[in-house]
Amino acid sequence: MLPVLIFPQFDPVMVHVGPLVIRWYAMAYITALLVGWRLVRHLVRLAPRAATDVQVDDFLTWATLGVVLGGRLGYILFYQPAVYLAHPLAALQVWHGGMSFHGGALGVIVALALFTWRNGLSFLGFSDRVTVVVPMGLGLGRIANFINGELWGRPAPASLPWAMVFPQAGPEPRHPSELYEALLEGLVLFSVMWIVARRPAIRERPGFLAGLFLFGYAVARSICECFREPDAFIGFLPFGTTMGQILCIPMAIAGVGLMAQAMMRPARPVLMPALPADSP
């Protein structure tokens, strides 16, 4: 029998600077937003141009608010509504954790809708470019989850070479499901999105990339949920499903619908007048 790996006890705090504390999870968010901002700046310049660089810069604030507020509200509503209804002020205690990707996704969708309406942009065209970089942020977030020793997997056979004992989860070896998600929802999905986004014919069909992301994430998350331990306060749902899988069903349906609609509509080669790559 192979020796079982023991989860290394990482310090959840990345660095102390006087009274300032920067945690790995916060750094994952910051890195994802900043790198994503630079990549979206590049993507919107590809023909047909979807926005100006200045508009992408402005959207960074909207995206940050959408992710943080949506992620927090989603966690409260989807996972622990009774707890926060009884203790509403606990919703402000974000340092205790509790963020939902599905809530964050809804928050960003609202931010995209308001921002594109206010700036006279194509909602689907701009959303296509933004969703390409989202998996990168997901991957970084799951790595931060692993460093924090949270969201571990279900029990795994000790013969599995990468089975790992998480001290907070008991003595059983488990799947490091955070790393599965970082790989599938992060690296693999980002690679697929980036490759497809490079095709001009796809960029001329607004909504296809956004639909591909929704469907791709739903599939990747549903697979990873088969190895992830359900939240203790929810457990398994009917037919052995999890809350994460249930929330992925409407995402998958919406994704297929967007892709089908994009392919049935005539290609739209111009979303806004072409601008030089260095134009604001």
UniProtKB/Swiss-Prot annotation:
A 1,2-diacyl-sn-glycero-3-phospho-(1'-sn-glycerol) binds at R142. GO terms for cellular component: plasma membrane. It is a multi-pass membrane protein. The chain crosses the membrane at residues 59-79, 97-117, 207-227, 233-253. Its main location: membrane. Its EC number is 2.5.1.145. It is found in: Cell inner membrane. Keywords: Cell inner membrane, Cell membrane, Membrane, Transferase, Transmembrane, Transmembrane helix. Pathway: Protein modification; lipoprotein biosynthesis (diacylglyceryl transfer). GO terms for molecular function: phosphatidylglycerol-prolipoprotein diacylglyceryl transferase activity. One of its GO terms (biological process) is lipoprotein biosynthetic process. Pfam families: LGT. HAMAP family: Lgt. PANTHER family: PHOSPHATIDYLGLYCEROL--PROLIPOPROTEIN DIACYLGLYCERYL TRANSFERASE (PTHR30589:SF0), PROLIPOPROTEIN DIACYLGLYCERYL TRANSFERASE (PTHR30589). Belongs to the Lgt family. NCBIfam families: lgt. Catalyzes the transfer of the diacylglyceryl group from phosphatidylglycerol to the sulfhydryl group of the N-terminal cysteine of a prolipoprotein, the first step in the formation of mature lipoproteins. This is Phosphatidylglycerol--prolipoprotein diacylglyceryl transferase. The lineage of its organism: Bacteria, Pseudomonadati, Pseudomonadota, Alphaproteobacteria, Acetobacterales.
